[in-house]
């Protein structure tokens, strides 16, 4: 009986310790700590795995590794939204054109976007934006920005023209920006090299690592062409293999640019005079609601993430007319860093905007 009591107490103590550890971890992750972002930048800036730019009323308050090219993840979708607005303003596309959901679904890769595409569809249904299994082209663009749907982004790259979007990089003076390529087809790259290029399973990751960026893009475009045609895609039947080792390669191959590029772009959006008024109006229509704080006259943001990357671009003008732009980029994150940064980026941005005391720390 004594032995059973000892075992019982031991189990109780172990459970209590586990609960205490979980409670401490929960507090650590959820604790509002805008300083964490600054501390992270200070700790990792010499590794060149992060960058930060902050500008207020035209004055640069902070700049770290602003010329270092890093993976953008979904932050790159800002460029697609700007080109969308340009083509709307030039009447090259009709924002109210009705797009069949099926045209988007062919680019959707289940369980690879943290539920973004299904969440957008659910939201669109609630708002009665879907009629006869169709919705407007503008809704597709808003789904790309507000919900970060990769399927919508790939569709828009096709609709607007991949070459046209890549040409817009020069027009927007994004001088360090990599060329765009489809968002969803690269997810099939491991299955593709094993099935179509007959690479043994135990060698496929190494083959992917050794591909030049031009070769990688070329294969991604080939897969994309198959995905466009339902019959062709079924015929090839490429398996989806997205284990963490592959995701690291995929993440490293994402489109890259510098914080300086995106500071330039969001600055143009925030000053409201760099683009023709119809284009600016459409940009604001797409981004409206991405920042829900009433302290702003107008504001917008778009971030991106992978298991290793976290990025965010924010622009805002407060009710007193103060203009703030913030670009944060990071790579090589571990899971704890990623979660803590995600939890505190919005607090960090708000502190920069509202607190002179916090700005003195920059």
Can you describe what each PLM-predicted range is?
Residues 6-19, 25-38, 46, 61, ...:
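Structured C-terminal helix/loop/strand segments within mature extracytoplasmic catalytic/sensor domains
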Residues 22-79, 83-190:
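Active-site-adjacent loops and short helices of periplasmic peptidoglycan-processing enzymes
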Residues 141-261, 265:
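Mid-domain, small-residue-enriched loop/turn segments at the edges of structured enzyme/sensor domains
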Residues 110, 170-171, 182-183, 194-196, ...:
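Alpha-helix boundary/capping detector
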Residues 1-3:
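N-terminal secretory signal peptides that target proteins for export/translocation
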Residues 102, 212, 355-356:
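Helix N-terminus capping/helix-initiation residues
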Residues 7-9, 52-59, 99, 106-112, ...:
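Short low-complexity stretches enriched in small and charged residues
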Residues 121-129, 195, 200, 308:
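Carbohydrate-binding/catalytic loop surfaces
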């Amino acid at each position: 009986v004594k032995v059973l009591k000892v075992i019982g107490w031991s189990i109780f103590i172990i459970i209590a310790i586990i609960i205490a550890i979980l409670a401490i971890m929960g507090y650590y992750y959820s604790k509002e700590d805008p300083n964490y972002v600054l501390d992270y930048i200070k700790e990792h800036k010499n590794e060149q795995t992060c960058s930060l730019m902050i500008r207020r009323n035209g004055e640069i308050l902070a700049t770290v590794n602003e010329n270092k090219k890093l993976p953008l993840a979904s932050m790159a979708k800002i460029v697609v939204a700007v080109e969308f607005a340009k083509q709307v303003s030039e009447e090259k596309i009709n924002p109210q054109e009705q797009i069949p959901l099926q045209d988007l679904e062919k680019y959707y890769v289940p369980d690879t976007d943290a539920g973004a595409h299904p969440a957008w569809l659910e939201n669109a249904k609630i708002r009665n934006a879907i009629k006869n299994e169709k919705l407007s082209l503008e809704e597709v663009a808003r789904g790309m920005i507000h919900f970060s749907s990769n399927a919508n982004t790939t569709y828009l790259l096709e609709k607007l023209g991949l070459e046209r979007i890549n040409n817009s990089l020069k027009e927007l003076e994004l001088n360090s920006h990599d060329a765009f390529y489809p968002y969803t087809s690269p997810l099939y790259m491991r299955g593709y090299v094993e099935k179509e290029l007959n690479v043994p399973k135990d060698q496929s990751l190494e083959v992917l690592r050794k591909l030049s960026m031009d070769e990688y893009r070329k294969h991604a475009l080939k897969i994309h062409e198959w995905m466009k045609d339902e019959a062709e895609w079924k015929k090839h039947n490429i398996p989806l293999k997205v284990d963490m080792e592959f995701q690291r390669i995929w993440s490293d191959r994402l489109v890259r640019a510098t914080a300086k590029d995106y500071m330039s772009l969001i600055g143009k959006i925030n000053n409201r005079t760099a683009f023709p008024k119809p284009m600016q109006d459409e940009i604001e229509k797409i981004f409206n609601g991405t920042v829900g704080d009433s302290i702003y006259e107008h504001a917008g943001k778009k971030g991106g993430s992978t298991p290793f990357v976290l990025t965010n671009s924010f622009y805002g003008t407060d009710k007193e007319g103060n203009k703030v732009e913030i670009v944060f980029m990071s790579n090589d994150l571990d899971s704890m860093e990623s979660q803590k940064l995600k939890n505190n980026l919005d607090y960090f941005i708000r502190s920069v905007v509202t607190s002179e005391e916090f700005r003195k720390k920059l």
